[in-house]
Amino acid sequence: MSFVIATFYHFVKLSNYYDMKDEIKVACDNVELKGTILLAEEGINATVSGERNAIDKIFDFLRSDYRLRDLTWKESAAEYQPFSKMKVRLKREIVNLGVSNLDTSVRGQYIDPDYWDDFISQPDVLVIDTRNDYEVKLGKFKNAINPHTQRFRDFPQWAESFSESKDLKVAMYCTGGIRCEKSTAYMKSLGFNDVYHLKGGILSYLEKTHNKSGNWEGECFVFDDRIAVDHSLAPSDKIKCIFCSSKVSTDELKSVPRGQVVCSDCKSLSIERKLEFNTNL
């Protein structure tokens, strides 16, 4: 059996998001979806997985709400169900930047994946990766700036210390688009004028371009049991252990915590070394 993995987000004011939780959970359970949906006043953010018919039905349901009628999503395939449960959670933010009263309606301009390579090749464009450091280590765009953040909440502090001219063009990207979209709103609030972001993120770029230019280097970390995907969006078979750099098997990948790609041999490391690693996440 094959499964469809759908990722989506939408920044839109949902004043009644508390009331939406139960009805969305019931709709997902009725079609046996698994995954996580986050709801906040600023919008919705989710990754869900199920059979083809289930995915179609849940989006018909969600888009019946006029505020979500423009909802779009990205799909990939898996041979196994990457999630064990269906969770619908209420949050202050759909992606946690930790900045109060940020107006996400004032944000950067989209760059379509088809034009991304040409855009970032311009000499006056700075490319910024808004993902966490452990994600960047698996793969990134050539010449992209790595802020070396351990979590998304670290990004504002890095951005405030960013010394480049606010008149330069800034092109930002992330996995699926949500972090870079919110980051552009923050950069705009700091006074950066020309701010852009990759529409749909790395996953859309790889889906549309198949990395023909070679600008993408490595694998793309994803937040499910696949751990990472290659340029064709297939589960990666090239992931290496963060301790010894040996290749990590598919079975081992299914059981690792987020950001901790560890082979079987290194799982027997001393407690002290594991604790040292964990404190750096």
UniProtKB/Swiss-Prot annotation:
Transmembrane regions: none
Keyword Transcription regulation: no
Keywords, in A-Z order: Oxidoreductase, tRNA processing
UniProt superkingdom: Bacteria
A GO molecular function held by the record: oxidoreductase activity, acting on paired donors, with incorporation or reduction of molecular oxygen
Keyword set includes tRNA processing: yes
Catalytically driven reaction(s): uridine(34) in tRNA + AH2 + O2 = 5-hydroxyuridine(34) in tRNA + A + H2O
Ranges in coiled-coil conformation: none
Active-site residue numbers: 174
EC number(s) recorded for this UniProt protein: 1.14.-.-
Residue pairs linked by disulfide bridges in the UniProt entry: none
Any GO BP annotation: tRNA modification
Occurrences of domain Rhodanese (ranges): 121-214
Pfam families named in the record: Rhodanese (PF00581), UPF0176_N (PF17773)
Function: Catalyzes oxygen-dependent 5-hydroxyuridine (ho5U) modification at position 34 in tRNAs.
Annotated family: Belongs to the TrhO family.
Protein name: tRNA uridine(34) hydroxylase
Species: Wolbachia pipientis subsp. Culex pipiens (strain wPip)
